């Protein structure tokens, strides 16, 4: 269920598959990730890494052919993400499967259905890519 803000207006949520991040989007993604990590939902990190490490991580994700980065926005600001991870070509034994990883939503954006939309978009992408 989507919560309305104090003005009674329902926030706008959107999810998109990205293959490039503008500087402002990279900054928003790092901000959201840092808050999620601090809140305990840090997809492996116990404390936020230095900002340059986090930026390098997200840039690196975009370079890996087996990873699809989906970002979630709340009122046009990146507030979360998830990745669809396909097996590498040499992993024939698991060529039929893919995994969802690094799924998070910043604490300030929770309660609006963004997490569910990220999962739905990842499932749709898995189907589109024959998984």
Q: How should each PLM-predicted stretch be described?
A:
Residues 109-113:
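Glycine-rich phosphate-binding loop
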